[in-house]
């Protein structure tokens, strides 16, 4: 009887911890990438692309409360083992947005010219990281 009671308690504890981690993991903005955003939504979602233009997607459960933001690319330098600044693009969004895409426009080409590994950031107007993700660009 004691073994089954102990098993039941540990099972409930495991379920509670697992649910809590799942809820916490979904509370932050998530960044991901696609080839383009069109009428039917995201096209070609991946974390690996050939050189060229991409679209950066950010999705959140709550309003981002941002207006002037930037997307920054840092490229991994295999010689030093560190990421180094590569490019930065400025955008203006509405503070109530929960789902936003950043694509090529007249001021921001959003292009990856060189193959490699990149860390991509969404930065607020004080250059604080809102969210980030890694992407691989292949030839």
Question: Which residues make up each language-model segment?
Answer:
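Bacterial N-terminal signal peptides
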Residues: 9-18
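Sec/Tat signal peptide C-region and signal peptidase I cleavage site
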Residues: 19-25
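Bacterial N-terminal signal peptides that target proteins for export
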Residues: 1-10
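Interdomain boundary/hinge segments at the C-termini of tandem beta-sandwich modules
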Residues: 137-139
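Contiguous segments within soluble domain cores/interaction surfaces
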Residues: 26-115, 119-125, 129-132
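Generic cytosolic/nucleocytoplasmic N-terminal low-complexity/intrinsically disordered segments
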Residues: 1-2, 19, 74
């Amino acid at each position: 009887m004691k073994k089954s009671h102990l098993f039941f308690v540990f099972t409930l504890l495991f379920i509670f911890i697992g649910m809590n981690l799942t809820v916490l993991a979904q509370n932050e903005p998530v960044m991901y990438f696609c080839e383009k955003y069109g009428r039917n939504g995201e096209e070609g979602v991946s974390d690996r692309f050939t050189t060229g233009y991409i679209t950066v997607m950010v999705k959140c459960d709550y309003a981002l409360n941002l207006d002037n933001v930037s997307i920054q690319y840092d490229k991994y330098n295999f010689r030093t083992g560190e990421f180094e600044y590569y490019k930065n693009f400025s955008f203006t969004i509405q503070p109530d947005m929960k789902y936003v895409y950043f694509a090529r426009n007249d001021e921001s080409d959003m292009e990856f010219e060189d193959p490699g590994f990149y860390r991509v950031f969404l930065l607020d107007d004080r250059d604080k990281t809102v969210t980030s993700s890694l992407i691989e660009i292949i030839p």
